[in-house]
Structure formats: structure tokens, C-alpha cells
């Protein structure tokens, strides 16, 4: 999550589509925008850990990673009353040591399967194209919360996904209720399938919206 100027818009857009999303926030964001995190949580959206200081965790000292992760979780729990169990690595970068450390802390490391690349400020039409084509059940769509083009594109994205038959839920809802699990690379996969082969998720029409 970046700034907070679109918080109310996002809550309204998601509510109108009856959609729930997972927001990965940093501790620094929590320091600045605790009220916005509370609004998102109260609206039924999931708040997850995106680190405290947004460091590069690949090659990071284990004790430093643990401390940084715990601090972000502490801040989120202070605001929402719930300790997060999902973690997204800053920059999408990690290594086996970091993943093992985070798993040992009870955190599921989450990656995305469809990136809107909205940080590059594409047109709303481009965002729609990237996030509504070739979507399969269990997909995690990545957006950033404080970009105007994303806010403009989102109603059409949500409408298209629902018309394709997808239920829009949080990552945790899919893990708890769906036929999916997270592998050691943070990738969503069916519990009953091997990861070495290309997979078409045909048995569960859930898609996940993730913001950071």
C-alpha cells in the first residue's frame, strides 16, 4: 500500500461489486494511515504483512528479517485486532532462507499470478486488459492502492471477472475454503496437483484481489 487518497473510493468500488480483497501493508504505512487500515478491515478486507521498512529480504540477516516482520505484524494487530498470517516480500524478491524463516514464524509467503503493472501508470484500458484476460481459478491479481488509473479500471475489472464466473475473495478465504495451497515459492497451486506441470485451475472459480 502506498498513499491513502483512494481508500474510500476502493472501499466503495469493492462493496458495490460484493468483492473482498487482501491489502498488504508496510509498518511505515500503518504508522501514517492507521485510520485507513481500520476502515479497510472494518469493511471486511484482509490486512496482511508487507514488511515494516520494505527491505530487500533476499540475503537479509535472519534475526533482522524476524524483527522487521514481527514489527509490522504488531502494528497491524494494534489497529485491526488480528495478527496477519500472510506475507508478501518487498519487490517480490526472496530466497529459500527467507521463505523458511517466514514459514517458521507461521507466515504464508504469497506471490501474485497476474500483475497489473499499475505502478508504471498505464492507461485504465491497459490495466483492464492485463487483469481480465487468461485468468484461472486461484489467480492472485496485483494492484497498488493509490493510483488513479487503477481506481478507474477497477469497476470494469471486477465486472468482467464476475461475468467470467469468478468469486472474488481474500487470499486467506481461498486457502481455508478452496482446493489450493501455497508452495515454498509463494505460488498458489491446487492441493491435489504437482507443480512441475502447467496447471489449468478448472475446479474452483475463485480469484483473489491483492493490493500493496
PLM region spans:
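Active-site-proximal beta-strand/loop segments in catalytic clefts of secreted hydrolases
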Residues: 1, 24-28, 51-52, 88-92, ...
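Active-site beta->alpha N-cap acidic-glycine motif
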Residues: 1-60, 64-78, 82-84, 176
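Active-site environment of divalent metal-dependent phosphoester hydrolases
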Residues: 4-6, 32, 54-55, 93-97, ...
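Conserved, mostly hydrophobic/aromatic
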Residues: 14, 47-50, 72, 87-90, ...
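C-terminal domain-boundary segment and adjacent tail
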Residues: 16-17, 21, 30-32, 149-211
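Non-membrane alpha-helical structural segments and their capping/turn regions in soluble enzymes
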Residues: 62-67, 125, 148-151
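His/Asp/Glu-enriched short active-site or ligand-binding loop at hydrolase and phosphoryl-transfer sites
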Residues: 85, 93, 98-134, 166-178
